């Protein structure tokens, strides 16, 4: 029984042993508490240790978190407040502040838009303070605006004419009006007026070979035209036509203009009837069938073809009379060349005489 109390006392002594935190790996000291312990010293320690040897404490955990959450707006707000206080002090000391020292951005109490530090520029404030001009009113108008608007919208063309213009028109003499009316009637009737006699129309039909092709032309032209004269100069006979034939030819020409080419069959279209396959087959040429042998005509060169085209252009442009007048004039190309040759010969003769006199 005596051994049991001894063991109990040993156990009690083991429990009362002092705990060493340096040997415990799981023990971690709170940094805030550690800083507090370092900074918070007794009065005796402060008296004995000099101030230069005091340990400087770093930023606390709360200050670090605030710095991480700082987006720059807080610094902007503080800068604005500091500048505003500086301006107020400057105004008190100097009396008035010069405009040259002011920045482009003015900071007022109303310009701060809250925690974001939004500021309004000078142009933005002026735009906000600018008053819109009121719309025009017709309260003091002496003219009936509605009547004028209705008159302007009226389909009558004389609505936009001023009264002064109408008075000037009424003041013109009646003789001028009669003259203008007569000239206007003449201008209107002149295009539609028919000549006293009808031109004799002839039918030209020619067949010729040019550039390997057989061309057949059939035209109805006036007998006095350039094409008719060129055709008659070759000794060909023409056929005189009547007015009915001319109208029929004109109607046929108009009908041809309205015709449109048929749609060409494509190889990519569906082919239920086999029409596309037939279109692929090579068609027999005119030479194989002997059609060229039946058609006879003279072979013309480029000069003769140009002469035919020029005659057609003269009739189409209506410059036959103008060409006839210039062809009879003395100031033609050959006459000018003769004049220039005479001038050159005279100069050479004068030079030769000058050289002979010098000798």
Curated annotation (Swiss-Prot):
Q: Which domain of life is it from?
A: Eukaryota
Q: What protein family does this chain belong to? A: Belongs to the SWC5 family.
User: Does the keyword Ligase belong to this entry?
Assistant: no
User: What is one GO cellular-component annotation here?
Assistant: nucleus
Cleaved signal peptide residues: none
Described function: Component of the SWR1 complex which mediates the ATP-dependent exchange of histone H2A for the H2A variant HZT1 leading to transcriptional regulation of selected genes by chromatin remodeling. Involved in chromosome stability.
Bias (Acidic residues) ranges? 12-48, 98-113
Tell me the InterPro entries matching this sequence. BCNT-C, Swc5/CFDP1/2
Which residue stretches belong to region Disordered?
A: 1-124, 155-197, 265-300
Q: How does it assemble?
A: Component of the SWR1 chromatin remodeling complex.
Protein name listed in UniProt: SWR1-complex protein 5
Biased composition, class Polar residues, residue ranges: 286-295
PANTHER family hit by this protein: CRANIOFACIAL DEVELOPMENT PROTEIN 1, SWR1-COMPLEX PROTEIN 5
Q: Per the database record, which ranges form the BCNT-C domain?
A: 282-359
BP-aspect Gene Ontology terms: chromatin organization
Report biased composition (Basic and acidic residues) as residue ranges: 172-182
Q: Which UniProt keywords apply?
A: Activator, Chromatin regulator, Nucleus, Transcription, Transcription regulation
């Amino acid at each position: 029984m005596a051994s049991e109390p001894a063991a109990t006392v040993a156990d009690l002594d083991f429990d009362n042993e002092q705990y060493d935190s340096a040997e415990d790996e799981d023990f971690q000291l709170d940094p805030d508490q550690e800083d507090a312990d370092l900074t918070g010293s007794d009065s005796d320690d402060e008296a004995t240790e000099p101030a230069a040897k005091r340990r400087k404490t770093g930023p606390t955990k709360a200050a670090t978190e605030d710095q991480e959450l700082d987006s720059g707006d807080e610094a902007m707000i503080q800068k604005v407040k500091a500048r505003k206080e500086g301006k107020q002090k400057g105004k008190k000391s100097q009396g008035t502040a010069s405009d040259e020292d002011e920045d482009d951005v003015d900071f007022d109490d109303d310009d701060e838009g809250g925690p974001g530090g939004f500021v309004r520029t000078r142009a933005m404030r002026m735009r906000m303070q600018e008053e819109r001009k009121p719309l025009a009113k017709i309260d003091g108008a002496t003219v009936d605006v509605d009547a004028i608007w209705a008159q302007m919208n009226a389909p009558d063309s004389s609505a936009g004419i001023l009264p002064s213009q109408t008075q000037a028109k009424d003041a013109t003499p009646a003789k001028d009006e009669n003259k203008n009316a007569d000239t206007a009637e003449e201008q209107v009737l002149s295009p539609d007026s028919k000549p006293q006699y009808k031109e004799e129309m002839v039918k030209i039909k020619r067949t010729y070979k040019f550039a390997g092709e057989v061309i057949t032309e059939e035209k109805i032209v006036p007998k006095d035209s350039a094409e008719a004269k060129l055709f008659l100069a070759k000794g060909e006979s023409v056929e005189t036509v009547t007015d009915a034939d001319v109208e029929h030819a004109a109607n046929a020409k108009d009908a041809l203009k309205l015709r449109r080419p048929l749609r060409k069959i494509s190889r990519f279209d569906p082919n239920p009837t086999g029409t596309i396959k037939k279109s692929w087959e090579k068609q027999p040429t005119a030479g194989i069938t002997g059609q060229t042998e039946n058609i006879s005509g003279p072979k013309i060169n480029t000069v003769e073809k140009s002469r035919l085209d020029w005659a057609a252009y003269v009739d189409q442009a209506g410059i036959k009379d103008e060409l006839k007048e210039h062809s009879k004039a003395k100031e033609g190309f050959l006459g000018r060349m003769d004049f220039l040759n005479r001038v050159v010969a005279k100069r050479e003769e004068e030079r030769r005489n000058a050289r002979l006199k010098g000798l």
